[in-house]
Regions:
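Acidic, glycine-rich loop-and-beta core segments that form the ion-binding/anion-interacting portion
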Residues: 12-38, 43-48
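Alpha/beta catalytic cores of nucleotide-metabolism and tRNA/nucleoside-modifying enzymes
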Residues: 1-5, 17, 24-27, 46-69, ...
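Conserved residues at beta->alpha junctions
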Residues: 11-12, 73
């Protein structure tokens, strides 16, 4: 295939890991272990690393390799933070689950609500379908509401990312990475970040 073949490898959670895969020929590396919404790797194996810190650590590589933030992306704000931390791109799983284009059949419950199955590749069910058996399973399967066309979700994510970049006054991922400033946030600060409207009792 020559230079037309792009090799993506992973997953790793350390600078040494990304350097090794780059030295072995990877063009891009998926970074993060056990951060996905239906992933149980950290619990099952005792291995893993906080997702954002993984991206920061891996971004210190001096190899010519793209960093893919993989797992734990829950909203457009998480995408902005992953890109700012050093990722060149992100992989999405749960954010796109339940869409028309996602794998699986649509089924309807007794109340007429539509759902699709969402499962990780390391789940018991996926391994049995793939290999006819399973070894150590590191994920679960779940059902998620049917969400229609994926383009609607992608459009919402795009708008959120553009807005996030505007808050930092940047026009590109490279600009964001050169100008970003991270701070530590308490759990109270995180709670404040979420919507918390109080209803008035008359």
């Amino acid at each position: 295939f020559g230079h037309a073949l792009h090799i993506m490898a992973g997953n790793v959670a350390t600078l040494q890991g990304i350097n090794d895969l780059a030295d072995w020929g990877a063009n891009s590396v998926r970074c993060n272990i056990g951060g996905g919404s239906i992933c149980s790797t950290r619990i099952q194996t005792g291995h893993g690393h906080p997702g954002l810190q993984t991206i920061i650590d891996c971004s210190h590589t001096d190899r010519d390799v793209a960093i893919i933030a993989d797992g734990g992306i829950r909203n457009s704000g998480d995408i902005v933070k992953a890109l700012a931390a050093g990722a060149d791109a992100v992989m999405l799983g749960s954010l796109l689950s339940g869409t028309r284009e996602a794998p699986g059949e649509v089924f309807t419950d007794a109340q007429g609500r539509k759902y699709k199955t969402y499962r990780g590749m390391a789940s018991k069910e996926a391994q049995v379908d793939w290999r006819g058996k399973y070894s150590s399973f590191e994920g679960v399967s779940s059902t998620v509401p049917y969400r229609g066309k994926v383009r609607n979700i992608l459009s919402d994510l795009e708008r959120g990312i553009r807005s996030g970049f505007s808050y930092s006054g940047v026009r590109s991922i490279e600009e964001m990475q050169h100008n970003v400033q991270f701070i530590r946030q308490t759990s109270a600060g995180l709670g404040e970040s979420r919507t918390h409207i109080q209803t008035r009792k008359w």
